[in-house]
Amino acid sequence: YKTHYSIWALLGSPLMIGCDIRNMNDATRNILMNRDLIAINQDAMCRQAVKLNGIWAGEDMVMYSRNLSNGDIAIGLFNLSENKSAARFNLDELGLPQSTGHTLEMTEVWPKKTSTVTNGTWIQELDAYDCAVYRAKVVKA
């Protein structure tokens, strides 16, 4: 459910649910009520995410990015393989080369934790069929 809901949010799709919400378990409820992910989906800019061409650990790792109305960037990494894998992308791919003196402060929405991109490269290891979604803010390096 997490991967499915995450891609819907990034693509700006309607967030509909096809289960009896009175009887859903806590894990499902936590996914469907993730306020950070809903905020990305409902962003006022109404832009859809675009697929990026990253330096992948394999063709089963996919990355999407979506510009948000306040200048943040929503980033989704999706491991579509049956093996643990690492995704790597350079800030150049998001239009933020190191020469600008800026980097990204990445706040993960599953779970909520913040870290900063160093040396212009972000590496994220994901379990099989897992995903990571970030709300990234441009900050001084």
Name each region found by the language model:
Residues 1-43:
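Aromatic/acidic polysaccharide-binding cleft in carbohydrate-active enzymes
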